[in-house]
């Protein structure tokens, strides 16, 4: 048997809007069937009975309210209306104009007014227990009661207040059950008229389960219609049943007999089933309107009505509730709201450690535990949706994610703390050794932790330096000022926005017509368009700007600082704290005294902070002991007595501590007596001259009259000084670290900049030494400086490259001059070209490229000099048969004379600069003399050797045909300075050779009057032999120029194809004498097409492949032939022989075009005699030189036309390594 306790539950709500207060009191009642349905009571109750209102078809025992007036009278009770408000509501408010109606407005439901019930003060027989709901609640007990009563059809709880809001009116009312009203005449009475009823708990539980199963079936049929806008489904209605059962506080009395319970068993069951079905329908209808409040009201109202009939069914497994554990609706609502608020705060990261309302329940409260267990399921609570619209299922998931994340963060923090604790424990003894007293000031900045940090910073700086040096090793980024990785050591590229290619598409032109695909990893092939590096918007700052930035910052710091102090290694920090180790005098307030001080002191340089701090702590300890011994501190003039000699002749002890860098007795530079002994002696003298035997204190010395200069006299000031020392030292250390980092950055930038500039200069030197196309050298250098973000300008002059590195920050430039003798080395040129392409395509760094380039420059040639002499001799031997009509007997003589020329060129000339200047002239004189001597040899009346073939073949490799070609290419590429110089040099060089050939032939003619006078070979080999000699010449000329064996196939193929075209074109032209430049242009065009296709499709070095073919095409024998004719004519004229008009034109055409020899009829001999005599004059050699220039121009046009056909748009990424 369950009984209610004698204690009362009083709920007090406070409203800030109208400052009213209401108290709900639940008094003890002897009736065990008392229902706690709250209604207000008025002190002026008219006793109106509402029993005539309609009830449901089955009469259910309806609770009634007993109104207790203020004077204790108990008027007639009125049953609670279950329908809409009647007329008595308006009558009551019409008779009480000072009362106000309180309405409950919910979405989708009409406003309902409560019936007229006056408010009054209830009589209480027992004590009162007050429950104050939490302040954060969204719904008050009045609102919740209105929801329950209105939805269940029992009426509405009305909130009333007086018009005067200044006074807080306390209204107390008592709700008691009364006998159910008699049914009206028009309605039948229910099957049970008993005033109380009660069913067994087992029946209540089974009935509740049956109702849940039927309601779930109805919910499955109306799933869509029963889901509200906030995502709350029908299942929430049933999930809350377990929680809502605890609302019911109805308990039956034990006095009721089993027979009475059995008699009432059937009728209540039927009525409860109908009531449940009605509430399910109400829930579905209200859900369709989207009204969460109405849904909750309907459910809670149904549960409240069912609880009043069932006597309080509980969840399965719950224990019997006692009257002590019974909760009011306010308590349950507060507990539910508190739990939901707590969960919402946990989800939002604002977990509250206090649960409001939890103090109202005792630990042994069984029902409270059961209710709390139900409330722990966030999904089972529908009342929470009146507070927030967050679906609890999603809320739980989010809460779990947040909890997991917090747990991970907590574990991580715990690991970090553990590591820090271990590290701190490791360094604990070091810190403890320097902190021996309670007033130790600041901790030592030279801890192991800071040393480790400095080591890490040093490592980071080294990595940064390494990365800066190899910055372009990765994809080059041109940062703007807005970028996070903006480099302060850069300056805007002045010529970037004026470039004509700024808006061009960066897609590589090599992809047009690229029929082969190769990997670009080794640098020997052209990478794809993704590797293209656009021109930089910013260039690296110059060395001068970086140095000025470094020095100006130092000077700026010194000028802005009033005190310049050097610490440690003597580096000026520029930011001097006002108090450093106590070396600067301070005022009592701690401000520094502005007076001149030495910028450098030995004391601050020798000792570190540890030693200073130990000395300072020792002084503090000594002064503490001295203070304990002498409670009364002596005055300043008493120090003279302590320093005077004692009667025994022993001077009194005087404590004077001298610490390096810490001057307890401060002095300034202007004082002549800076130490304490000086003014102590002065005080002794003053005391002795007083005449009073020391009774009158001596005058205070000037050095101590200023309060600021008084020595530190108490331990507090020493402690403060020690503290300030640590702080100032840390500040200075931070400034020093910042300065060191800045210096390291600037130093690294300067080193990196110098390394890049050095690489550019080395690359320029290598390209010039190894024979890169001179008309494209400036383009190569510009591409290299662009990729390295160096602002460089280049001007090429034959034999010299002028380089200017600009600095936009200081508007200055640094001029560099690269001078070297231009040569040809095809193997090293290919290696240099690979490095150049890898750098330009951002595949390797400057450091690696510089090392590889230095290795190339230091490396020896591929073939030794003696082997090159052999190759040179063989080359001169095979060129004579196909180019100068040489015979088989002429080949050995050409090889011998060619070896002489090769020896002087390869071995002698590089070792003697003096001889190098006259090498061409001396060799031409010697070879011409020897060749005529060999040609003069006769056997049986014939000459087995040809003077013209031997002389021209021996000098073929050193003739200026390649020089003339390079000058012509430079002029064609608008390089006017280099082209003009080189072309003029080629003409003068030709005249030098002509002079040497003429002089050699004339000298031998003077010596031998029987010298040969033939300027052509009477016989020649079959033209089919040229198929053998042309590739052989290309082979040996490539080896002389240090070509690799792997490069030879392409060279031989291209040179052979070019000569074949030239041969057949010359054979089919009617007048090849006057069209030599045409045949040369067509042959050069063929070589250019094949070489550029080899570069584009095969990704090889086009220049190296084309060079032997160009050597075959260059008119090497033009100048020698004209000079030879002039030499023979002059020699014969000197000896009186006029027969010098043999087939001159035939030999000129042959040497100019390297075509088939055109035979001249003997009938034309007299016609050509005049031309021969004219060419034999000194001006004839010059005319032939100009003929050579015409042929070179034809070759130039053919090469440029071929390049235009293969590369119509040029190459933006890297320069064309072709002619």
From Swiss-Prot:
The keyword Transport does not apply. One of its GO terms (cellular component) is membrane. Residues 1-11, 259-273, 330-346, 395-421, 448-470, 616-641, 693-713 have a biased composition (Basic and acidic residues). Keywords: Membrane, Transmembrane, Transmembrane helix. It is a multi-pass membrane protein. It is found in: Membrane. Residues 422-432, 598-615, 653-673 have a biased composition (Basic residues). GO terms for molecular function: transmembrane transporter activity. Its main location: membrane. Residues 42-53, 159-171, 219-231 have a biased composition (Acidic residues). The chain crosses the membrane at residues 864-884, 888-908, 918-938, 945-965, 983-1003, 1021-1041, 1049-1069, 1075-1095, 1100-1120, 1184-1204. Residues 104-115, 435-446 have a biased composition (Polar residues). It comes from the Eukaryota. Residues 57-68, 136-155, 565-577, 642-652 have a biased composition (Low complexity). Residues 1-273, 303-490, 503-533, 555-713 are annotated as: Disordered. Pfam families: ThrE. Belongs to the ThrE exporter (TC 2.A.79) family. This is Pheromone-regulated membrane protein 10. It comes from Yarrowia lipolytica (strain CLIB 122 / E 150) (Yeast).
């Amino acid at each position: 048997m369950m009984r209610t306790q004698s204690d009362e539950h009083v709920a007090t709500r406070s409203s800030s809007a109208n400052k009213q207060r209401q108290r709900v009191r639940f008094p003890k009642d002897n009736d065990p069937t008392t229902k706690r349905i709250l209604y207000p009571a008025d002190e002026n109750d008219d006793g109106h009975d509402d029993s005539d209102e309609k009830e449901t078809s089955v009469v259910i025992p309806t609770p009634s309210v007993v109104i207790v007036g203020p004077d204790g009278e108990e008027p007639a009770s009125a049953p609670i209306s279950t329908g809409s408000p009647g007329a008595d509501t308006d009558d009551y408010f019409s008779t009480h104009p000072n009362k106000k109606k309180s309405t409950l407005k919910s979405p989708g439901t009409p406003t309902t007014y409560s019936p007229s019930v006056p408010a009054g003060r209830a009589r209480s027989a027992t004590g009162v227990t007050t429950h104050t709901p939490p302040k954060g609640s969204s719904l008050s007990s009045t609102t919740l009661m209105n929801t329950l009563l209105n939805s269940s059809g029992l009426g509405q709880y009305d909130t009333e207040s007086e018009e005067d809001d200044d006074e807080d009116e306390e209204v107390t009312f008592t709700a008691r059950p009364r006998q159910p009203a008699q049914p009206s005449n028009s309605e039948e009475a229910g099957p049970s008229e008993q005033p109380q009823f009660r069913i067994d708990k087992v029946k209540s539980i089974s009935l509740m389960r049956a109702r849940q199963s039927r309601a779930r079936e109805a919910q499955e049929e109306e799933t869509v219609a029963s889901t509200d806008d906030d995502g709350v489904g029908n299942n929430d209605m049933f999930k809350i049943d377990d929680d809502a059962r605890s609302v019911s506080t109805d308990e039956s009395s034990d006095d009721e007999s089993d027979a009475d319970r059995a008699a009432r068993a059937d009728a209540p069951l039927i009525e409860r089933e109908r009531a449940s079905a009605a509430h399910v329908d109400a829930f579905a209808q209200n859900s369709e309107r989207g009204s969460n409040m109405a849904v909750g009201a309907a459910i809670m109202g149904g549960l409240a009505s069912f609880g009043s009939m069932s006597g309080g069914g509980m969840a399965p497994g719950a224990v019997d509730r006692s009257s002590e554990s019974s909760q009011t609706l306010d308590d349950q609502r507060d507990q539910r709201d508190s739990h939901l608020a707590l969960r919402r705060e946990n989800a939002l990261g604002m977990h509250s450690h206090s649960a409001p309302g939890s103090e109202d329940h005792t630990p042994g409260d069984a029902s409270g535990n059961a209710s709390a267990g139900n409330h722990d399921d966030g999904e089972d609570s529908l009342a929470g949706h009146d507070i927030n619209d967050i679906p609890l299922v999603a809320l739980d998931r989010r809460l779990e994610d947040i909890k997991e994340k917090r747990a991970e963060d907590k574990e991580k923090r715990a690991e970090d703390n553990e590591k820090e604790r271990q590290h701190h424990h490791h360094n604990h003894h070091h810190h403890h050794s320097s902190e021996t007293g309670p007033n130790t000031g600041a901790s030592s900045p030279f801890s192991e932790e800071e040393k480790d940090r400095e080591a890490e910073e040093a490592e980071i700086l080294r990595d940064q330096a390494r990365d800066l040096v190899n910055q372009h090793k990765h994809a080059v980024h041109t940062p703007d000022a807005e970028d996070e990785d903006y480099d302060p050591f850069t300056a805007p590229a002045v010529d970037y926005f004026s470039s004509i290619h700024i808006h061009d598409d960066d897609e590589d032109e090599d992809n047009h017509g690229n029929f082969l695909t190769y990997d670009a990893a080794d640098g020997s092939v052209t990478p794809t368009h993704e590797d293209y590096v656009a021109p930089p918007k910013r260039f690296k700052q110059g060395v001068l700007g970086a140095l000025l930035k470094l020095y100006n910052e130092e000077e700026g710091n010194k000028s802005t600082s009033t005190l310049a102090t050097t610490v440690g290694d003597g580096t000026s920090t520029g930011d001097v704290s006002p108090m450093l180790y106590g070396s600067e005098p301070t005022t009592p307030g701690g401000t520094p005294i502005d007076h001149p001080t030495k910028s450098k002191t030995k004391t601050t340089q020798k000792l570190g902070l540890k030693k200073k701090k130990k000395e300072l702590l020792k002084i503090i300890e000594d002064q503490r002991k001295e203070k304990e011994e002498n409670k009364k501190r002596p005055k300043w003039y008493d120090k003279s007595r302590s320093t005077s000699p004692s009667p025994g002749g022993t001077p009194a002890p005087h404590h004077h501590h001298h610490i390096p860098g810490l001057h307890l007795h401060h002095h300034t530079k202007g004082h002549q007596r800076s130490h304490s002994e000086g003014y102590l002696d002065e005080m002794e003298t003053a005391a002795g001259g007083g005449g009073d035997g020391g009774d009158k204190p001596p005058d205070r010395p000037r050095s101590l009259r200023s309060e600021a200069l008084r020595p530190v006299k108490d331990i507090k000031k020493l402690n403060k000084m020690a503290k300030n020392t640590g702080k100032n030292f840390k500040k200075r250390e931070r400034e020093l670290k910042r300065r060191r980092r800045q210096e390291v950055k600037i130093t690294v930038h300067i080193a990196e900049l110098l390394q890049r500039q050095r690489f550019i200069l080395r690359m320029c030197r290598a390209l010039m030494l190894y024979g890169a196309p001179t008309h494209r050298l400036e383009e190569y250098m510009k591409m290299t400086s662009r990729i390295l973000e160096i602002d460089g300008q280049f001007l090429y002059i034959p034999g010299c490259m002028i380089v200017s590195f600009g600095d936009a920050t200081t508007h200055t430039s640094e001029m560099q001059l690269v001078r070297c003798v231009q040569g040809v080395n095809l193997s090293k040129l290919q290696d240099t070209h690979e490095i150049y392409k890898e750098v330009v395509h951002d595949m390797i760094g400057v450091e690696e490229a510089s090392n590889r380039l230095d290795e190339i420059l230091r490396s020896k040639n591929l073939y030794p000099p003696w082997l090159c002499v052999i190759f040179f001799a063989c080359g001169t031997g095979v060129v004579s048969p196909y180019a100068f009509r040489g015979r088989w007997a002429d080949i050995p003589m050409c090889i011998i004379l060619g070896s002489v020329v090769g020896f002087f060129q390869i071995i002698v000339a590089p070792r003697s600069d003096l001889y190098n200047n006259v090498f061409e002239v001396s060799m031409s004189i010697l070879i011409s003399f020897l060749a005529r001597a060999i040609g003069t040899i006769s056997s049986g009346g014939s000459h087995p050797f040809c003077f013209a073939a031997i002389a021209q073949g021996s000098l073929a490799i050193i003739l200026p045909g390649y020089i003339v070609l390079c000058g012509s290419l430079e002029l064609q590429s608008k390089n006017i300075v280099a082209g003009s110089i080189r072309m003029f040099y080629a003409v003068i060089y030709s005249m030098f050779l002509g002079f040497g050939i003429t002089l050699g032939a004339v000298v031998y003619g003077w010596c031998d009057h029987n010298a040969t006078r033939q300027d052509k070979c009477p016989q020649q080999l079959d033209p089919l032999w040229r198929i053998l000699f042309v590739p052989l010449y290309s082979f040996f000329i490539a080896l002389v120029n240090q070509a690799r064996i792997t490069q030879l196939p392409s060279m031989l193929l291209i040179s052979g194809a070019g000569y074949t075209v030239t041969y057949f074109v010359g054979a089919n032209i009617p007048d090849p004498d006057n069209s030599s430049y045409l045949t040369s242009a067509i042959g050069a065009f063929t070589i250019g097409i094949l070489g550029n296709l080899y570069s584009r499709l095969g990704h090889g070095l086009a220049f190296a492949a084309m060079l032997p073919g160009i050597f075959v095409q260059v008119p090497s024998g033009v100048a020698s032939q004209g000079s030879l004719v002039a030499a023979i004519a002059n020699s014969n004229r000197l000896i009186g022989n006029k027969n010098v008009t043999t087939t001159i034109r035939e030999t000129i055409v042959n040497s100019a075009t390297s075509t088939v020899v055109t035979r001249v009829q003997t009938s034309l001999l007299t016609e050509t005699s005049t031309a021969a005599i004219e060419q034999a004059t000194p001006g004839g050699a010059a005319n032939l030189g100009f003929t050579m220039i015409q042929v070179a121009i034809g070759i130039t046009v053919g090469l440029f036309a071929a390049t235009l056909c293969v590369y119509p748009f040029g190459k933006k990424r890297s320069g064309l390594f072709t002619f």
